[in-house]
């Protein structure tokens, strides 16, 4: 128990730098995304929330997550967990708790490559066999606090109890945001 408390205390100390607040929006042909985060763009602990809507069939995903960012030079590694509400249209409405991580590689001229993936097996969901989401792309920050993004997002489920597996979100997007 003491080791856990000491370890958690060290993580808090390592992440005690100023935490930036970010607001982002993404749009694709069939998807709208709104995202708010605290501490996601710097090393240490972070929290974020996200709402994703497939504008074609009305599927919605609402998420809140937390995790830890580890900066190693120009690379930031992320490990995290989310609580996600899946508002599917094929009888798969429910909750999932995906676990995953990501990587961001800072490049010259304020460009960056990023990617992340999260998965929740049947034990961490109540309505589907598996929930998977992935997101990756390129970002550019021409001036602080503006960030512009181009990427690809996927989210899908494997059905359970006779319901078919299907794709919830799938496609390229453009986006932008502000980080204060």
PLM features per residue range, with description:
Residues 53-57, 72, 85-91, 121-125, ...:
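Gram-negative outer-membrane beta-barrel proteins
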Residues 138-142, 167-180:
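Outer-membrane beta-barrel "beta-signal"
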Residues 18-68, 175:
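Short glycine/proline- and aromatic-enriched beta-strand/turn motifs that initiate or cap beta-hairpins
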Residues 23-29, 47-53, 79-85, 101, ...:
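Transmembrane beta-barrel strands of outer-membrane/channel proteins
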Residues 38-40, 68-70, 103-105, 140, ...:
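Residue-level signature of outer-membrane beta-barrel architecture
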Residues 30-34, 41-43, 58-64, 75, ...:
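Residues that define the transmembrane beta-barrel architecture of outer-membrane proteins
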Residues 42-47, 72-79, 109-115, 140, ...:
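Repeated loop/turn-to-beta-strand initiation elements of outer-membrane beta-barrel proteins
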Residues 1-22:
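Cleavable N-terminal export/targeting peptides
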């Amino acid at each position: 128990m003491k080791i856990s408390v000491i370890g958690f205390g060290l993580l808090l100390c390592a992440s005690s730098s100023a935490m930036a607040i970010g607001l982002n929006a993404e749009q694709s042909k069939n998807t709208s995304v709104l995202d708010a985060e605290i501490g996601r763009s710097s090393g240490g602990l972070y929290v974020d929330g996200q709402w994703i809507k497939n504008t074609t069939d009305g599927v919605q995903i609402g998420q809140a997550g937390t995790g830890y960012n580890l900066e190693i030079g120009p690379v930031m590694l992320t490990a995290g967990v989310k609580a996600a509400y899946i508002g599917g249209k094929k009888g798969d409405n429910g909750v999932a708790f995906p676990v995953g991580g990501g990587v961001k590689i800072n490049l010259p001229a304020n460009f960056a490559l990023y990617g992340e993936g999260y998965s929740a097996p049947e034990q961490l969901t109540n309505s589907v066999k598996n929930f998977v989401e992935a997101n990756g792309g390129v970002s550019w920050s021409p001036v602080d606090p503006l960030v512009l993004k181009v990427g690809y997002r996927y989210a899908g489920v494997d059905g359970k109890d006779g319901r078919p597996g299907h794709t919830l979100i799938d496609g390229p997007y453009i986006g932008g945001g502000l980080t204060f």
